[in-house]
UniProtKB/Swiss-Prot annotation:
Gene: PKH1
SMART domains recorded: S_TKc (SM00220)
Name recorded for this polypeptide: Serine/threonine-protein kinase PKH1
Keyword tags: ATP-binding, Kinase, Nucleotide-binding, Phosphoprotein, Serine/threonine-protein kinase, Transferase
Phylogenetic lineage: Eukaryota, Fungi, Dikarya, Ascomycota, Saccharomycotina
Compositionally biased tracts (Low complexity): 511-521
Gene3D superfamilies registered for this protein in UniProt: Phosphorylase Kinase, domain 1 (3.30.200.20), Transferase(Phosphotransferase) domain 1 (1.10.510.10)
C-alpha cells in the first residue's frame, strides 16, 4: 500500500456497513443481502471515476492496478507461491473484510427455508474481463462460485482514495445507493467487501453496455424508441428527487442497459443528498428542498446546465436540463452542445447556442425547447414533462413504463408525420389538459413565469412549417394591395428574446395571390392537389405540398441584395398555377424558381436549354437550401431547418466536388456582383460547370488504372510517377495532398524519399 497506512479514522469512514430494512429480512431473495453487523463488517465504498470529457483530474497511475488478481487456478498457484506470512496476512484481511449476509437456505430434513449468516468476500468470486475503468476505479466482471451468477464489481484503491482526497465521493455514492436500493431504474448494490488494498462494490450486471453505445451503434433512435427510453429516464429521475437525491451528472455514459434492455442510472459519486426537512403534510411524507442551491462544480461539459457556468450554482433542475440534452441526442445522434474543446462547449451552453437538425420531429422539438432554457425557473417540471404531448400514450401511474417490452431499435428517419404541426388536443381528458398547459409554455407551478406564454392555438400556428411564424399568420388572410406591414416574431429556439422584423411590400400585380393554408388537420385542408401537379415529380411523397414559391432573378446586375433575404424572397409568394411553366423560353437561362414545402424543404430549380452540342437537352439542378442565420434571416421557421454556419446549399448527389462547385456558382451569382458586369458571365460559369460535371462523370465510370507494382520510387507510389516515352525519364508528379504544403517541407520529404530509394537499391544489390 505504499509508505502510508490506513488510520483508524480512515477505516471507520470507509467501512460503514449497509443496513437493510426490516422487510429485507423477511423476504426471500436469491441474491445475497447486507447483514446488520457494524462491529465486524468492513464494507467498502464505491468510487465512480470521471470519464473522458468530464470535469476533474485524471488518474495519476494506470487503473489496471485496481483490478484484482483472477482467482482461478493460476491465481491459486500464485497464492501458493507467496511468502507464508504474506499469504496469512491476505487470508486475515479476506476474513476481516468479508461481508456478512443473510442467505436463504433450504433445510434438507424439513424442507423449510431458514436464514443463515454467511461471509462472502474476494475468494467467493471469480473475476474476469474488465468492463470499464475511470480515474480511480475499475469495473470487472465477476462470477459467484456457488451460484454462477454474474455481477459487476467496482474496485477502488484505498491508497489512491486517501492520497487524492476522494473519500467523500465514495461515501456519498455509498449512502446514495443505500437509499436507492430497490428503486426501479437505479443500479442495485448487493453488498460491499474489502481486502487490505482495495474496496469492492458488488453491483448489478448490465450486459448491454451503456446508452451512448446504443446511440452510436444506430446513429440515432426513432420516435418510438426515444419515447420508450425517455419515459424510463425521466421516471427514474423523478424517483431520485422524491427520495432527496440529485444526480448532477446524468448523461448517456451513466445510463446502462440491463439484460431486458431497460435503463439503469449509475455513477452517484457526484450526487447531492438533500437533508430531510420537517413535513408539513398530513401524511407525514418526507420533504426535500429540491431548489436548494449548491456551488459544487460537477458534471460533464456537454450536459452541464448554464446556471452552473453563469451563476456558479445548481439545484435539482440541472437533471432536467441534462434530460433535455439526452432527448435531443436520441433523435439527432449528437449532443446539442458540442465543440472542439470544453471551453468552446461552455460558451455554447452559456449562450444556449444549438440548432436542430433537418427533419427533427416537431413534437420532440417543442419539448426540447422548453427544457433547454437558460433560466431554470422557466423549465418544465417533471410533472409537466410527463404531461407533455410527446408522452401522451405513456402511463406513468400504473408502472407500465417498466413493464412494457422494449421496441425494435431503429434509427430515426424523416417522415411526413413527424413534420406535422402540433395539434390542439381535447379539453375533456385531465391528462390532456396538463399537456395543453405544458404546450402553452407554463413554467413551474411554484414559480412565476417571467414572460407571458402563447396559447395552444398560437403555438399551432407557430409550428407550421412555412417560411416564418409571422408569414404563416399572413397565409390565413389575403394581403391588401398597396399596404405595408411589419410583423414581430419572438423566437422560441432558446430563451433569449429575438425579434425578427419581416417587412413585406406587396406589388400591384394581379397574379400575386396568397395560398390558403389551413392550420387544422390535414383532412380539413381546402387546397386542391391539382395546384401541386406541376411540381409533383419533385415532391417526396403525397403529404408534401408547396407552401411558398418565388421566381428568382437570374442576372446579377438586378440583384442589390441576396435573394435569400426576407425582403427579396418572402415577398412574392405565388400559387403554383400562377407561375408560367419554367420551360418557356427566357433567353439562354429559362427560369430559377425558389420553393418551400410543408416538409421543411427549400428547393431551387434552374432550367436552361443549351444551344451547343447538347441542343434541345434540358438540365435541371435541384438544391435543398437550408438557411440557418437565425439572428438575421430567419426565413425558414425554427420548426423547419436550423444549421450552424452560413447559408449552405445541398444537392441530391454524393459528389463532394460537385457540391462545392455548386455552392460557388450560386453564392457568386446571388450574393455579389462580378467585377466586370457582363450578361454572359453567368452563362459561361454555368456552361463550364456542366462541362466539368460531364467530364467527371465519364472519369468516374472508367475503370481505375492498375498499378504496375507496389514499390516506392522516390518514396512515392507508382501512380505519382509519370514516364515520358520520348525522353524515357521519370518525372515526379507532386501529389495533390501535398499541394498545400510549403516548398521547404516538400523538399525535405523528397530528400528523405531519395535516401530511402538509395537504401532500397543497395538492399536489392546485396
Amino acid at each position: 500500500m505504499g509508505n502510508r497506512s490506513l488510520t483508524e479514522a480512515d477505516h471507520a469512514l470507509l467501512s460503514k456497513p449497509l443496513v437493510p430494512t426490516s422487510a429485507e429480512h423477511t423476504q426471500t431473495q436469491e441474491y445475497p443481502r447486507p447483514f446488520v453487523d457494524g462491529s465486524n463488517s468492513q464494507s467498502g465504498s464505491e468510487l465512480q471515476a470521471s470519464p473522458q470529457g468530464q470535469f476533474g483530474e485524471k488518474a495519476l497511475t494506470s487503473t489496471n492496478r485496481f483490478i484484482p488478481l483472477a482467482n482461478d487456478d493460476p491465481g491459486m498457484q500464485h497464492e501458493m507461491g507467496l511468502d507464508p506470512s504474506m499469504r496469512r496476512r491476505r487470508e486475515e484481511w479476506a476474513e476481516r473484510g468479508a461481508a456478512k449476509i443473510v442467505k436463504d437456505v433450504v433445510d434438507p430434513a424439513t424442507g423449510e427455508l431458514t436464514k443463515h449468516v454467511v461471509k462472502m468476500g474476494i475468494k467467493d468470486f471469480k473475476f474476469g474481463e474488465q468492463l470499464g475503468d475511470g480515474s480511480y476505479s475499475s469495473v470487472v466482471l465477476a462470477t459467484a462460485r456457488d451460484s454462477g451468477k454474474k455481477y459487476a464489481v467496482k474496485v477502488l484503491s484505498k491508497e489512491y482514495l486517501i492520497r487524492q482526497k476522494k473519500v467523500k465521493y465514495v461515501t456519498v455514492e455509498k449512502l446514495a445507493l443505500q437509499k436507492l436500493n430497490g428503486t426501479k431504474g437505479i443500479f442495485k448494490l448487493f453488498f460491499t467487501f474489502q481486502d487490505e488494498a482495495s474496496l469492492y462494490f458488488l453491483l448489478e450486471y448490465a450486459p448491454h453496455g451503456d446508452f451512448l453505445g446504443l446511440i452510436k451503434k444506430y446513429g440515432s433512435l426513432n420516435e418510438t424508441c426515444a419515447r420508450y427510453y425517455a419515459s424510463q429516464i425521466i421516471d427514474a429521475v423523478d424517483s431520485l428527487h422524491n427520495i432527496g437525491i440529485i444526480h448532477r451528472d446524468i448523461k448517456p455514459e451513466n445510463i446502462l442497459l440491463d439484460k431486458n434492455m431497460k435503463v439503469k442510472l449509475t455513477d452517484f459519486g457526484t450526487a447531492k443528498i438533500l437533508p430531510e426537512e420537517p413535513s408539513n403534510t398530513a401524511d407525514g411524507k418526507p420533504y426535500f428542498d429540491l431548489y436548494a442551491k449548491s456551488k459544487s462544480f460537477v458534471g460533464t461539459a456537454e450536459y452541464v446546465s448554464p446556471e452552473l457556468l453563469n451563476d456558479n450554482y445548481t439545484d435539482s433542475r440541472c437533471d432536467i436540463w441534462a434530460f433535455g440534452c439526452i432527448l435531443y441526442q436520441m433523435l439527432a445522434g449528437k449532443p446539442p452542445f458540442k465543440a472542439a474543446n470544453e471551453y468552446l462547449t461552455f460558451q455554447k451552453v452559456m449562450k444556449i447556442q444549438y440548432a436542430f437538425t433537418a427533419g427533427f420531429p416537431q413534437i420532440v422539438k417543442d419539448l426540447v425547447k422548453k427544457l433547454l432554457v437558460r433560466d431554470p425557473n422557466d423549465r418544465l417540471t417533471i410533472k409537466q414533462i410527463k404531461a407533455h404531448l410527446f408522452f401522451h400514450e405513456v402511463n406513468f401511474e400504473d408502472g407500465s413504463v417498466w413493464d412494457d417490452n422494449p421496441p425494435e431499435i431503429q434509427p430515426y428517419k424523416i417522415n411526413a408525420e413527424a413534420m406535422k404541426p402540433l395539434q390542439k388536443v381535447s379539453e375533456s381528458d385531465t391528462t390532456v389538459k396538463m399537456a395543453n398547459l405544458q404546450l402553452a409554455g407554463n413554467g413551474h407551478a411554484d414559480t412565476p413565469l417571467q414572460a407571458p406564454a402563447a396559447t395552444s392555438q398560437e403555438h399551432s400556428v407557430i409550428s407550421m412549417t412555412a417560411a416564418t411564424a409571422a408569414f404563416n399568420k399572413d397565409y390565413t388572410s389575403q394581403p391588401k394591395l398597396g399596404s405595408k406591414s411589419s410583423t414581430s416574431v419572438r423566437s422560441a429556439s432558446n430563451n433569449t428574446d429575438r425579434e425578427v422584423i419581416q417587412k413585406k411590400v406587396s406589388k400591384n400585380r394581379a397574379s400575386v395571390s396568397s395560398p390558403s393554408i389551413s392550420t387544422t388537420s390535414r383532412g380539413k385542408d381546402n387546397r386542391s392537389r391539382s395546384s401541386d401537379a406541376f411540381w409533383s415529380r419533385y415532391l417526396q411523397n403525397m403529404d408534401e405540398r408547396v407552401l411558398l414559391m418565388k421566381e428568382v432573378a437570374l442576372s446579377t446586375r438586378n440583384l442589390e441584395d441576396s435573394p435569400v433575404g426576407l425582403e427579396n424572397v418572402a415577398l412574392d409568394y405565388k400559387n403554383p398555377l400562377d407561375i408560367e411553366p419554367p420551360t418557356d423560353s427566357a433567353g439562354k437561362f429559362y427560369k430559377k424558381m425558389f420553393l418551400i414545402t410543408n416538409l421543411g424543404r427549400a428547393l431551387v430549380f434552374v432550367k436552361r436549354r443549351s444551344l451547343s452540342m447538347w441542343e434541345e437537352q434540358e438540365f435541371e439542378l435541384q438544391f435543398e437550401l437550408e438557411l440557418n442565420d437565425v439572428e438575421k434571416i430567419r426565413f425558414i421557421s425554427d420548426q423547419v431547418l436550423e444549421i450552424d454556419g452560413s447559408r449552405t446549399i445541398f444537392i441530391g448527389c454524393k459528389e463532394r466536388a460537385v457540391l462545392m462547385k455548386l455552392w460557388k456558382l450560386i453564392h457568386n451569382g446571388m450574393t455579389a456582383k462580378p467585377k466586370v458586369v457582363s450578361p454572359k458571365s453567368d452563362h459561361k460559369m454555368f456552361d463550364k460547370f456542366i462541362l466539368q460535371k460531364r467530364q467527371n462523370t465519364k472519369k468516374k465510370n472508367q475503370a481505375p488504372p492498375v498499378p504496375q507494382s507496389n514499390r516506392l520510387i522516390n518514396g512515392l507510389p507508382d501512380r505519382c510517377i509519370l514516364k515520358t516515352p520520348e525522353e524515357g525519364a521519370l518525372h515526379t508528379k507532386r501529389p495533390t495532398s501535398l499541394q498545400t504544403r510549403s516548398s521547404s517541407n516538400y523538399s525535405k520529404l523528397l530528400a528523405r524519399s531519395t535516401q530511402m530509394r538509395k537504401n532500397m537499391t543497395r538492399t536489392d544489390e546485396k
